Curated annotation (Swiss-Prot):
Gene Ontology molecular-function annotations: 3-oxoacyl-[acyl-carrier-protein] synthase activity
Major enzyme class: transferase
Residues forming the catalytic site: C129 (acyl-thioester intermediate), H269
Gene Ontology CC: one annotated term: cytoplasm
The name this protein goes by in its record: 2-heptyl-4(1H)-quinolone synthase subunit PqsC
Assembly with partners or alone: Forms a tight complex with PqsB.
High-level lineage: Bacteria, Pseudomonadati, Pseudomonadota, Gammaproteobacteria, Pseudomonadales
Regulation of protein activity: Folding of PqsC and binding of octanoate are promoted by PqsB. Binding of the octanoyl group probably increases the binding affinity of the complex for 2-ABA. Activity of the complex is inhibited by 2-aminoacetophenone (2-AA).
Organism in which the protein naturally occurs: Pseudomonas aeruginosa (strain ATCC 15692 / DSM 22644 / CIP 104116 / JCM 14847 / LMG 12228 / 1C / PRS 101 / PAO1)
Gene for this chain: pqsC
Pfam families reported in the protein's UniProt record: ACP_syn_III, ACP_syn_III_C
Length: 348
């Protein structure tokens, strides 16, 4: 069985960042200081389609930069795995220039064509906030079995397209995209050591996308697709999300034959400080072994984990030879964790 290397990673965020006091939130009620402190978001970015920003254009920019920086020829990529939580695709680049909003085709086929990945099998997957981990596992499985040597993993989130800017939850989320390259490892210096996932649909309705009116509608408001957080979602999430991610981490570590003391760094999804800290405490991670990134970026759904990973690599908190755990939760609800032995990872 072949080893797997996380070879390169990059992210692309919107050009403009919105502070908590921005007029875009003028119609949102009850934005108290305690709200901001609890959720820990100070600023977040939204794609601006007027300036050509969307879930497709920015991921093309990021993927082209990664391929160029890693000296990877497009026709050498064997597989492309894409995730986008929004069901609405807004752009298809030069491939389908006249196609605008659509439900399908999804991203992988169109992006593969745009990037010139002439040999790549395109695949779309979905696990919301944990999609990056799912995609890494799928890619690693193909490489480990010898069915692929190079796999491009993409997560792109245009969540602002679904936000209800009369609801407090609109202040939490943000747009962004991430691209990673997985390759066959040449030695034992790097590998995906173990993965663990489980799910529980008991609280499926807590966070969903559904057709409805805005929470505080005007006379001209019409139903449309909005991200929707259950009215008591904060308390419901606190009843099961803090404990389930550590369960996934312990299972992954057990599969790898390791304990938490063997891990150098932890990379968590970034939904809220209280959840990240609960996950860290649940696995025995020290404060210096993980970080919070949602303050400057907002909650970028599936992009939060790769962005936090990239930040740790860029800041030197994660180094070649380190063993790391990546973990998070996904609406629905799913819980995932992975243990990686990292080699040199190109950040571009």
């Amino acid at each position: 069985m072949h080893k797997v290397k996380l070879a390169a990673i990059t992210c692309e965020l919107p050009a403009r960042s919105y502070e908590n006091d921005d007029p875009v939130f003028a119609a949102v009620p009850d934005l108290s200081e305690s709200w901001w402190q609890f959720w820990g978001v100070n600023r977040r970015g939204y794609f601006d389609p007027r300036n050509g920003e969307n879930e497709f254009s920015l991921v093309v920019r990021a993927a082209e930069r990664l391929l160029r920086s890693s000296d990877t020829a497009p026709d050498s990529v064997d597989m492309l795995i894409c995730s986008a939580s929004s069901p609405i695709m807004t752009d298809a680049g030069d491939v389908l220039p006249d196609l605008r909003g659509r439900l399908y085709p999804r991203m992988a086929n169109v992006l593969s064509k745009q990037l010139g990945l002439s040999r790549a099998l395109p695949l779309d997957s979905q696990m919301e906030c944990a999609s990056f981990l799912l995609n890494l596992r799928l890619a690693a499985s193909m490489i480990r079995q010898g069915k692929a040597e190079k796999v491009l993993v993409v997560c792109s989130e245009y969540i602002s397209n679904l936000l209800d800017f009369t609801s407090r939850t609109s202040t939490l989320f943000a747009d962004g995209c991430a691209v990673a390259l997985l390759t066959r490892g040449d030695d034992d210096s790097c590998d995906l050591l173990a993965s663990a996932e489980h799910s529980d649909a008991t609280f499926y309705e807590v966070a969903t996308g559904r057709w409805r009116l805005p929470e505080n509608p005007t006379g001209e408001a019409k139903p449309r697709l909005y991200f929707s957080l259950f009215s008591d979602g904060q308390n419901k999430m606190a009843s099961f999300v803090p404990t389930n991610v550590p369960i996934a981490m312990r299972r992954a570590l057990e599969k790898a034959g390791l304990g938490s003391d063997d891990i150098d760094y932890f990379v968590f999804h970034q939904p809220a400080p209280f959840l990240v800290k609960a996950w860290a405490e649940g696995i025995g991670a020290r404060p210096e072994q993980y970080q919070l990134t949602m303050g400057d970026t907002g909650v970028m759904i599936s992009v939060s984990i790769p962005y936090t990973l990239m930040t740790g690599l860029r800041e030197g908190k994660i180094r070649p030879g380190d063993r790391i755990v990546m973990a998070g939760a996904a609406t629905g609800w799913g819980f995932a964790a992975q243990v990686w032995q990292l080699g040199e990872v190109l950040v571009c």
